[in-house]
């Protein structure tokens, strides 16, 4: 998702695959889905933005389980856009969920956290950065 897009609150806006070896599965999904990869520098390593073959549109991320993703199990992680991440994280715990990664910045894009719902499924909440008009 680019920083110029304004996501609709409550929508699934992105998905990342978080795994120990991003290069291995980058190549797997490039072969299976025809995606092309664009590296995203993360300091000493790169994660990957995966793009659709026909349009070049960004469709997913393939990320190392390091940095902000350290400690996450291998999984596809969907991001749900919320208006107020602090309020949504509080509601998560009030309703029986768990905060796995507390709210933290995601570069200039906004703020995210990772939650586990009462059934054990994991998702991320994302509050986009405020843009000046």
Predicted regions and their residues:
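Conserved short beta-strand elements that form part of the metal-binding/catalytic scaffold
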Residues: 2, 35-73, 118, 122-129
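Vicinal oxygen chelate
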Residues: 21-23, 54-55, 78-119
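N-terminal beta-strand motif that seeds the catalytic metal site of vicinal oxygen chelate
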Residues: 1-26, 75-80, 126-133
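Residue-level "edge-of-site" marker
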Residues: 42-43, 105-106, 133
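Conserved beta-strand and immediately adjacent loop positions that scaffold enzyme active sites
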Residues: 14, 47, 77, 112, ...
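Core segments of cupin and vicinal oxygen chelate
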Residues: 6-9, 13-57, 94
């Amino acid at each position: 998702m680019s920083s110029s897009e304004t996501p609709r609150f409550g929508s699934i806006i992105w998905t990342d695959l978080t795994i120990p070896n991003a290069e291995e599965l980058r190549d797997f999904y490039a072969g299976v889905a025809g995606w092309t990869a664009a590296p995203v520098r993360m300091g000493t390593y790169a994660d990957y933005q995966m793009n659709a073959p026909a349009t070049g549109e960004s469709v997913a991320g393939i990320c190392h389980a390091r940095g902000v993703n350290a400690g996450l199990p291998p999984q596809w992680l969907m991001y749900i856009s919320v208006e107020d991440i602090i309020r949504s994280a509080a509601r998560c715990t009030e309703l029986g969920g768990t905060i796995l990664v507390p709210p933290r910045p995601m570069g200039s894009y906004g703020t995210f956290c990772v939650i586990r719902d009462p059934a054990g499924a994991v998702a991320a909440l994302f509050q986009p950065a405020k843009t000046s008009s």
